Amino acid sequence: MTQTDYPAPFWPTRQISEEQAAFIEEAADEKAEAVAAERGQYVKIASVARAMPEHRYSQESITAAFKAYWLAQLRSPERLDQFHSRVGVDHRHLAFPMERYQEFASFGETNAAWLQAAEQLGAQAIDAALDRAGLSRPDLHALFVVSVTGIASPSLDARLINRLRLRPDIKRTPIFGIGCAGGAIGLTRAADYVLAYPHHNAAILAVELCSLTIQPDDLSPANLIAVGLFADGAAAAIVSGAKTGHPSTASRAPVREGPRILGTGSVFYPDSEDIMGWDISEKGMKIVLSPRLPELIRKNLAGDVDAFLARNGLRRSDIGAWVMHPGGPKVLNAIQDTLQLEDGALDRSWDCLKRFGNLSSASVLLVLEEVQMNHAPEPGTYGVLLAMGPGFCAEMILLRW
């Protein structure tokens, strides 16, 4: 029997044993801050900032453009209206004017366009995040760059180091293939770095140009949904070690310092490669998006979140801020239901989905920026940042303001 012969879903549902439940109950009596202090895990998100393309369109205008393009192929144009009206998006930013996209004739052309726009947006986002953190370019010791919508060698991080004239001894890490989980995974890797180098500052940049991956000849339901959901943009965050911030490092006061990272967690779901990702061919990147994703979330996420919180001495009821990747209405509703969150707990995610669409790896950083700059929790509030992506996997970060 092959893997595809298994009835859906074929991934293992995570069950909490009696021993795990007892551990969760006992650990919940501890203080997460004390746990973090013992492990030396005091790192902070000094800032987060976005950079969006100048071309902004309403959902209706984008839908109309695709209906006109596919006029001869769509058997029921109203089906596209239905898909696009249900994804919770009002406006999206695109890297190029809509009429430009018809000029791209090959994967090589779209990838070259990705490199051009991604470098520009990435530089803007990094500079904005440094400015908010009260830092300058020489204060940056490590750079983590996440993107799943284009490829380059030398990679995008190398080009940004040249463009911004970052220090020549900067440590750089390009990350590809983790999709919507990328913003959270990048934050985790940056936190790992500054734990090892507590005097250092690291930047995580997530830049995605999803519009350049659209397959114009693909009328599958997954692609029809993708052209109504995904968008373009970038976001960067500065993660600082516990011993930064003295006069020789910080050149000016930060605009508004972000939360501390108290802990991180990763969950990998075996044999779930077909849930999300790319089917890459000579034509480019074709979306893979399984309708079984909400079911995976409902069956597994609550237990995984509870186990993660228990390792840090907390329960779900202790969390006052949920920073969730806005993957779409079905994803957000599945998260809301399985975690039994109060109404309004995911408002910032819904708002970012409405205003920007799904920016893949950058989206969760946009939600974090919105929380930090416009809805900052009270000091002492615990938060969870969570994103999921190809693998299939989930990445969780415990925050405290």
Descriptions of predicted regions:
Residues 3-17, 24-39, 123, 148-150, ...:
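Claisen-condensing/thiolase-fold acyl-transfer catalytic domains that form or cleave C-C bonds
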Residues 85, 117-133, 156, 234, ...:
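Short, well-ordered amphipathic alpha-helical segments that serve as non-catalytic structural scaffolds
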